[in-house]
């Protein structure tokens, strides 16, 4: 087992401000493929100029996180694919320790995630097992996932109905249902700066709020009992409506607007519409 058996896959969208710091932090793995969802020819030229060994593909339309990562996973020629967000930085020895953990687990895992103190790992309390280096958990955040393609053959990849958010939870849920394992490697460290992988300002916030709610309702529809699903999400619609009224009365136009986007995302998902909203850029 060596570094050549791992491919790093990165999906970008208006990510020029962060992607180079991410790539600079990758010291050992040279199989790197990028799919840019904003068809940025200049970014491609800059990346290839600095890192000639990287393969970068441009998409003429914004495919979303899940679809784009599925393309990268399918394009990779290795058993293991390390999915990274462009605003993630690998700390010293992250790759070395991940490789060591793959060997320790004897490749018997579906997902292995490096550790970030800001991450949550489902219902796992990290303080109960402070000395354990490999922690089995319910789910991990999708900003850094080392995926074992051999295990994914029976599970499937990211749900392509989801444009943004909850792809990671959905995948981990299906892994758990398939009686496969998700681990966190506490010896491998990353820094994820969060919500900095794109630089389109308020348009990103509108898109983020819309898809956060759409994906939340979609996720609930997949995994909650019928009556619980409708009770929970009808209450969500009422709550968002009241918040819009509240912020409108307070003349806080920005918060009222973002709540409107949340309401639209939740409503569209509840009535069965696809995740159609895209940022206007």
Where are these regions (language model features)?
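Active-site donor/metal-binding and catalytic loop motifs
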Residues: 184-204, 215-216
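A short, conserved alpha-helix in the catalytic core of glycosyltransferases
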Residues: 139, 144-147, 151-156, 161-189
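Short, well-formed alpha-helical segments that are part of the catalytic scaffolds
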Residues: 10-28
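Glycine-rich, basic loop-to-helix element that forms the pyrophosphate-binding segment
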Residues: 59-76
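Short aromatic/hydrophobic "clamp" motif used to bind/position activated sugar donors
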Residues: 81
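Conserved donor NDP-sugar-binding/catalytic core segment of glycosyltransferases
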Residues: 89-123
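A conserved acidic beta->alpha catalytic loop
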Residues: 25, 34-44
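Non-catalytic, C-terminal membrane-associated alpha-helical segments of glycosyltransferases
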Residues: 207-215, 226-281
């Amino acid at each position: 087992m060596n570094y050549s058996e791992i491919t790093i896959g990165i999906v970008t969208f208006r990510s020029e401000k962060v992607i180079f710091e991410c790539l600079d932090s990758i010291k050992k793995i040279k199989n790197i493929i990028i799919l840019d969802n904003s068809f940025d020819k200049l970014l491609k030229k800059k990346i290839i100029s600095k890192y000639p060994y990287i393969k970068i593909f441009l998409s003429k339309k914004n495919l979303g996180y899940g679809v784009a990562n599925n393309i990268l996973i399918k394009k990779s020629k290795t058993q293991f694919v390390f999915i990274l967000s462009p605003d993630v930085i690998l700390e010293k020895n992250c790759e070395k320790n991940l490789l060591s953990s793959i060997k320790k687990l004897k490749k018997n895992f579906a997902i292995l995630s490096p550790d970030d103190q800001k991450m949550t790992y489902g219902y796992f309390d990290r303080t109960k097992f402070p000395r354990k280096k490999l922690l089995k958990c319910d789910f991990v955040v999708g900003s850094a996932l080392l995926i074992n393609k051999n295990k994914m053959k029976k599970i499937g990849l990211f749900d392509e109905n989801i444009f943004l958010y909850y792809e990671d939870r959905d995948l981990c849920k299906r892994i758990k249902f398939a009686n496969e394992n998700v681990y966190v490697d506490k010896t491998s460290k990353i820094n994820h700066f969060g919500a900095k992988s794109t630089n389109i300002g308020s348009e990103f916030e509108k898109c983020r709020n819309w898809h956060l709610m759409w994906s939340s309702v979609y996720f609930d529809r997949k995994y909650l009992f019928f009556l619980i699903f409708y009770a929970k999400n009808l209450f969500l619609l009422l709550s968002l409506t009241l918040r819009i009224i509240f912020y409108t009365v307070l003349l806080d136009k920005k918060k009222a607007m973002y709540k409107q986007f949340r309401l639209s995302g939740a409503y569209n998902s509840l009535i069965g519409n696809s995740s159609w909203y895209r940022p206007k850029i």
